[in-house]
Amino acid sequence: MSDRPGSASEGEGDEIRPYGEDRDSSEESEDDDPEEAKRIAEGFIVDEDEEDGEGEDDEEDEETRRRRRKEEKRRRKKERRMRREREEAELSEDELELIEENRGLREGRPLKRLRRRSGSEGSENDRAVPTLQDMFRDDEDRMEDDDDDLMDFIEEDEEDEANQGETEEQRRERKRAEKLKRREQARSRPELTGVDRSSWDEIFAVFGDGQDYDWALEGEDGMDLDEEEEAAKKDLRLEDVFDPAEIKARRLQDEDKAVANADRPERHQIVNSTLSDNPVFATDTLYPPPDFAAKWVAPKVSFRTQYLFYNQHPEGSYPIPTIDNPQPYPVYRRPDLEIEFEKAVSTALNMMFVQHLEVPYLWHYKRDVFSLLENQGQSSVLFLERDELWQVYVLGQRYRAIHERNEQTRQQWGKIKARKGDIEDEYFTKGLLGKACVASIEAAGEGDEWLAYHYASDIKAIKEEEAFDEVSKKLPERAEREDIRRGRIMKLVEAFGIDANKVASSFQDVHGQPAPVMNPDKMPLELADEFTGAAYSSPEQALSAASFVLVQELSKDPAIRQQARDFMDTCGLVTVNATDRGMSVIDQYHLYYNFKFLTNKPVLDFRDSPQFVHMLKAEEEGLINIAFDIREDMLASFTDALIRCCRSNDYGEIASAWNEVRMEVCNTLVKKHLMPMASKWIKEHLRTQAEEYIAERCREELELRVNVRPYASSGMEQGETPSVLAITNGKGDIRDAVMAVMLDDEGNVRTQTKFDNLRDEEDKTMFIELLEKRKPKVVVIGGFSAQTARLKDAALVAIRQHAIELLGQNPPVSDAYPDHEGFQYAMAEYDEKLKAHLIPLIFVNDATARLYMSSEEAEKEHPNLPLNGRYALGLARYAQNPLNAYCKLGKHIASVTFMEHHQKLIPQEKLLYHLERGLVNSVCFMGIEINSCVADPYQRAMLPYIAGLGPRKADAVIYGIQKHGALINRMAFTDLGLFGPTIFENTAGFLTIESDLKDMMLEAENPQEQPDPLDMTRIHPENYEFAQKMCQDALDLDVEDVADRHKSEVVQTLMLDDKRGKKLGELNLDDFAFNLQRQGEGNKRHTLGEIVSELIRYRSDRRPAFYVPTDWEIVTMVTGETERTVGRGLKVTATVRKAISARVFCQLESGLDAVLERDYVADEDQAPVTSCDEVFKPRQAIKGVVIMPEPARFQVRISTRPSDLRQGVDFVQPFKDEEYNSKDRRDAAEAATAAKKQRRAGKVQRIVNHPNWHVLNSGQAEQFLASQHRGDCVIRPSSKGPDRIAVTWKVDEDVYQHIDVQEIDKPNEYSLGRILMVSGQYRYSDLDDLIINHVKATARKFDEIQMHEKYKPEHELDAFLKNYVQAHPGRSIYGFSVDSDRPGYLKLCFLSKPTKDGGVIQTWPVRVLPGAYKLGNAIVPGVTELSNAFKMQYSEKLAEQGHQGKTPGIYLGKTPMHLGGRTPALGSRTPAMGSRTPALGSRTPALGSRTPALGSRTPAQGGPRY
């Protein structure tokens, strides 16, 4: 391509495949010689005999093993020579490049597929994963001779005879010479490895030829390792050679291999997204009985199922009105089908967790299982929709977690029973584990806590007997309160007559009768007086202690706690209280304003809303506090229900007195324990609920974007891929050229051209020539500024001129027509003719192109393309296949914005999990042609989203198909060992195999070696018999007619029949389905309908047409403006570009054009404006209001009339007004603000004569500094009094430090003090002195630390430490970052071992002073000294802890004093130091207490418990 701007490539040019690769080599081998390709592929398979033989050698003597090794070696040599001519020396490109990078011989490499290779050990599935042994074995293969098999055998025989008389020394010398010869041969044949001769010379020059260490390769008996290699070589792992991060990124860890080899869907083996950088691998545990799980799952599936089958929610509340359907047709409830619905849920759980079938497979091929035929097949009820199946899967996972937690508790109970013999606890086994603890994961955990509370001593003894090495978790109430429950006071507790277990059981049963409560014979205080003494000095204390024990027992009960959570979920109210800072920061233009005065909003109203995550974010920023409450009457009702289960029904003074005490217990229980616990739970519950809602809405938006066909113009057939020309001018700067990239219909880059300006005649002519030569079906355009509109206009002019040339007829001229109407009619006719020759010009969504252009992948694929060229390539790819473009993003898809204000508030892992689900739905809906997918690296990105697969399994499939060649039919998936039975069932229907239908020669024999027409369809192999039977019926053939023929021959005949639609339409599918159901085949109505659709139009694209963005979407994409920012009635600021008499041409800050007409400059009652250029000058800023937005033209029309400006609005809230925002609270706050302003207006405003002085509060100062640099500051009034000022300076992005400055020696109240004191130790003479020597000096220390190699941004520091320690085992690492929580401080974080091995990232604060750093008590001038001070203090801590007998670990280190012991809390001293050692068997005394006597107990208060 010429370097001259505007020049296009001449000729056809080189074919550049997507991803920078040519056509896959599997196509070439298939074309050359299929038999030879098959023979070569067989050479990759390791014989199982080798593996079996190695296991038997252990039982044989040395001589036998040696003989067997020689035989095995000879056999392997023969096999290697047979396949050497076609293999690439066994080292894949990725492995060679990885070696070269580690040697420093290559700077980078394009990202290419990983080639998995077979191992020498393990199962057959294991061989699909590369091992290190394969890599080194390849080197040995490459060094073998190149002679044929017969010569090799001759040489071996001659060698045995010729070498019989040589000595051992001679034999070793001969071996060395042979090895040297082989190395020289390797150097003379560099093409075998793809490394040129000069590169090999460099390698040998740097690393030598290996002879220096030949002595190390000889065994003790002088034998070379060539003969002893299997016996003497140590098994190496990839981790021993390559960087762990590289292995992890390429998914080559042992866990990844296990996932790839297991016959279970990859997404079932990983808890989070399979695309995550930190996958959480799931354990393969036995799933609980699906029937039991269904009873828990079914009522929670969806609003629809609750409404239809459980009679929940108000009548008519479903279907929910939408924008597309504001008045949906009502549906009838079907509570009579509740049992059938639970059976359908049970079946779904069984298929998902027992049979390991993924949701897309169930939805596409088992949908009939989740529906019920009625009216003799004329109608059906669908129990579970697609998204509901996904929800069943999620709920099934939650139930599994609950079940496993309860099983752990049940096992603990079994240990207690084994210890105590005949102990029984029916309430625990039936009431809790059988019912209450199954309600939620929280209740399951509380069941374990309940057991630990009531059987604390038994569990403690069990743990000590089992001699646990790790520090036990804290057992609730195992010190003082456990002692209380073992004391005499329990007699008083029993006198209350309250059995906590019976109370909990009665409390769950609303209509049940509470167990009777017996009263003592004495009054409460009278009876409590009997328990006074050393422990309790008064009856009130004794009664209080007994009440406390009773409250504890009731508050620990999982059933009661679950009731409290359900009550809060149903009746809870949420109120927002703004903090002092929030009152000033959250104004009417703030995103949080819509909930600033939120008051008593019901918890139920937060469902299906993202609002709560915004509230949590505001609370995190310190702007609001969220409070949960319950109406007094509702809370009283809940408390009364609890009191009813505790009170006595007797009458009399004693009964009333005891009932009063019991009532007090219940009130304390509810207010002090249950409601705070429920409030804490509901907060996290609402967070999770809101995050799930946002993630699901993002998934739905993604599916709307990708579930579309490729762009198709009017003349294209459905399913045809367009050739695309993409153009862009980037940011539209004068330096940005117009880049054009042309993709043909196969996705190959055909042209990459640069133009200066399409308005120039020369460039326009060359652009037209490009259109004529390449003939694109569509031109797509994109950019990053409003200048893209001008490029669009220029391109439209060129495209129209090109169409005129094709038409060969010039447009009509107005002068040739007598009137304007005639001219208009002629132009309309001409435009209609021209339309057929016009190439469409469209905008497309550029989210994927923006990410691709700046990715490392794009740079490696197309290093010669500039950024704008890569952006254009991304646009073209999106137009050809939006789904493929999004799939190619991988984990970076989470960076695409789907919900503008909400998406950033949820965890990336959760978002990625849901987005992956959306891609899985979309890819499975369309399906993939497997052979073309494997051959094209760009299409391979879609393969992981097929049901059953994932990135790891997809890599294995790609490697397997490349190894064996293109697949002929679906049976090859299992015949070649690519899929196990489960994965095949999940996957087969979505992977089609294209063949030439007309050229198929089907024979009844050997169907596995022939193509099958049904493999071209999305019909699942398990339904082939139905398809064949339907084709037979459609062709009106009898069984005898097809008996001796290929089963699918009738399918081929029908698919080639042009009238197949009519013939298949004559089949009565309803009767057929009903008869199948009566015969026990189950409901097959949907399956039969799908089979008919596929047979008529196999693999037809049933997705909607390509979505072209609306005008407003284009404006938002290019400029960032929306209807909310430049819509009608909004105030804007514009800059005058040009003024003429009738109008003014302006530009908004975003680049949009603004036009001001003369009539809209002034009101009618003002002096008229005769000429705009007299009033407005270029570069003048004016205030206006939008009166007519014109997004299609990238412009708005504005008015500057005062009357219009008064009616205009400054800002439109992105969220609707909140009905629960209290107007009274808002009015009171506004009145208080107004009063405050009035008071300030009455006061003399303090003014300091300095350019940095501003009358701002702290929040306003931060906003003022937001766009400025580090070290910039604002000096402002202080709220602490007239003798102080405040300095706010920018430490880092979103980090600001507020410095309190005391003024000393003030002449008067309003003058600045002659001495400015900071922190009581830094004195400055004036404000400039303060800024330069305090603020700027401190900022320089922050700049200095950021230049250090150990500095990382705060959000990256933890990952940096973890990755370093993982990559360098046995080494520690530390790093610095700004502490955003403590402005003016740094965080010094360090890690000594990987977190998976128990390592904990520890943090020390470093205060930044003017010109110094302070760590602990050490003040140092520089970063080097700071590092040394850290190392010294760290060493001192280690030494100190070593003397104290503690495990080294700063602050968070744990001291295993004895079994079950715990480390003191942060900052506490080790109790043993400085105090007397307790007697054997007693406890360590608390800090400050005296040593107990022999055998006595340790005082509990004051010190850490062990």
Curated annotation (Swiss-Prot):
Q: Keyword annotations for this protein?
A: Chromosome, Nucleus, SH2 domain, Transcription
Region annotation (Disordered) ranges: 1-194, 1460-1506
**Domain SH2, first and last residues per copy:** 1239-1349
Molecular function (GO) terms for this protein are: DNA binding; histone binding; nucleosome binding
Basic residues composition-biased segments: 66-81
Q: Which family does it belong to?
A: Belongs to the SPT6 family.
Stated name of the protein? Transcription elongation factor SPT6
- List the gene name: SPT6
